[in-house]
Each structure stands twice: as C-alpha cells, then as structure tokens.
Regions:
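Hydrophobic alpha-helix feature that most strongly marks membrane-spanning transmembrane helices
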Residues: 135, 169, 175, 203, ...
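Active-site/acyl-donor-binding loops of N-acyltransferases
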Residues: 2-21, 62-84, 215-276
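Conserved GNAT acetyl-CoA-binding A-motif
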Residues: 44-52, 211-223
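A conserved beta-strand-loop-helix scaffold within acyl/acetyltransferase catalytic domains
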Residues: 2-16, 53-56, 62-77, 81-83, ...
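Long, C-terminal catalytic modules of enzymes
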Residues: 277-283
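C-terminal structured domain segments across diverse proteins
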Residues: 152-164, 169, 203, 207-211, ...
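N-terminal accessory interaction module
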Residues: 3-51
C-alpha cells in the first residue's frame, strides 16, 4: 500500500491526504507494449496508483481519477550499440562529456577510476562504500532514499553497481537492477564536495559504456523526466501516473483538493517566470 496523495512543492511534501492505494508499476517493457495493465482486486484499499501508464492506454476502472504527472519515460537503446548511441547525442553533449572526463582525470592523476561490481561478493564490497557516499547526498538528507541501508536490498544476483573514485575515496555511485529486458536507473548519487568535477556525469558515461554489448536491450531511466535523461536518452515513451479511487464523495473531494493545489502551484510558477522575464527586459 502507498499514499501518493501528497501536497508537494518540488521535493517537499507540505501535507498528505491519507488513502490506501494498490500500486501498479509498469515496467519499461510493458510501457513500450502500450497496453493498459489488468488491475488487481482492491480488497480494503481505497484505489489504485498506476505508474508509467502509456498515454494511449485506457484503464478498465471507474471512479474519480487524477493524473499525478505526465512525462516521457526515457531509455538508452543498448542493443543498437555504443557507436549508434554516441552518434545520436548532440555535438554539444559529446563535447561536454569529453570536457568533464578530462577535468576529472586531471584531478585524479591523469586517469578515471571507475570500478564495476557484478557478483554478490563484489556487491557486498560495493554497499558500504556506496552508503558512505549516499550519506552525503541531498536525497539522503531530504528524502532518505539515496541507497538502501540494508545490504540485502543491494546484494542481489540481478544487480550491478559502479563506483567512481578520486584517489582512494569513492565520490559517486550508481546501482541498477534488472527488469525484463532493461537495466533500471535505481539509485545514483555523488558527494557534493566533488560536484565541480561532475562525478555523476562521468560515472554515468562509464556505466553505459560497460553495459553496451551485454544481454540487456535497454537502460531504463524510470519514471519522471530531467535534463540529464533528455540529454543521454536515445528513445522514450509518453506516460502518465494515474490515481483511480473508489466512487464516493470523500474520494472526489480528495482528488479535487489535489487538482486545486497543483493548479495553484503551476500558476505561481508561471507568475514567477513572467516576473523574472519582465525584470530582465526592464534592465
């Protein structure tokens, strides 16, 4: 059960409306297939929370509905090969990647030290090192979601991890699990003390290079969007996250409150953008 009925501004949750929801999370393979999922029985729950529902798919469910967010679920086509991926990047992106790699190498004795962890034994070594980096990240401070503290959630047969070192100090990590035909972009972070060296970007490029030619067809950037995803992805599928509740006045009121709050936040953002634009034009 999950409770996504949260009044949020950015990553900060201001309040929540309690509802017990059955989460139905579509994999990238399922999203690309384009069909709506079969919804499980609710039992005592208040509704469903369906993530990565393809835009063209229609759920077989009645009741008040709220589209929490729309986005393109982006991915890298690993099966096409590294050369095709790099050719699809913009010239500016390729130049930026080279520049960041050179800068980090210069700070580390002339080389980039990325280590890959594939087996359970290797991932057992990866976990405490990655946790040390995760403890420094904003994801950990604000959300507590940087990387599982329990090693059992990381040391798995269907997972892979990478660490970027400066000297002998780990400064960035990436941990992925396998789902269907894709590697998932599950956990990533870097030590903010090294942010000027762009360790996350350098590590991401190294990890993708390692995955090309492997058994998986895609690297899945998961739900949501972001500049780095748009920059690196070679494909995507338009999706939405949807909440469907049982039919009653309380649930309709709850979703009405969510829509009203989201609309107010969006309007405030538009006003802020217009004021900033007016300020620049007035100089």
């Amino acid at each position: 059960m999950t409770n996504p009925l949260s009044l949020q501004v950015g990553a900060r949750t201001l309040a929540t409306i309690p509802r017990r929801l059955v989460r139905v999370a579509l994999s990238l393979d399922a999203a690309l297939a384009g069909a709506a999922p079969a919804l499980p029985a609710l039992g005592g729950a208040d509704g469903w929370y369906v993530t990565s529902l393809p835009e063209e798919a229609v759920l077989d469910a009645a009741g008040p509905t709220w589209v929490r967010q729309r986005y393109v679920r982006r991915f890298v086509d690993l099966a096409a090969g590294e050369a095709a991926w790099r050719a699809g990047l913009s010239a500016a992106t390729r130049a930026a990647m080279k520049r960041k790699a050179r800068k980090l190498a210069a700070a580390n004795g002339g080389h980039i030290d990325v280590r890959c962890y594939r087996t359970r034994a290797e991932l057992a070594l990866f976990h405490p090192l990655a946790r040390a980096v995760a403890a420094t990240t904003y994801q950990e401070r604000l959300l507590g979601t940087a990387l599982p503290a329990d090693a059992a959630g990381v040391v798995r047969d269907d997972a892979r991890g990478w660490l970027l070192f400066v000297g002998e100090r780990p400064v960035a990590y990436l941990w992925c699990s396998a789902q269907g035909t894709a590697w998932r972009y599950d956990h990533v972070g870097h030590d903010p003390a090294f942010a000027a060296l762009s360790p996350g970007a350098v590590l991401m490029e190294a990890a993708l290079r390692d995955l090309f030619g492997g058994p998986m067809a895609r690297f899945d950037f998961l739900e949501g969007d972001g500049q780095h995803k748009r920059t690196l992805a070679s494909g995507g599928v338009a999706c939405r996250d949807v909440v469907v509740l049982r039919e009653n006045w309380g649930n309709r009121a709850a979703l009405g409150a969510m829509r009203g709050f989201d609309g107010a936040v969006a309007a405030a953002k538009r006003v802020a953008v217009l004021r900033a634009l007016a300020g620049r034009l007035g100089r």
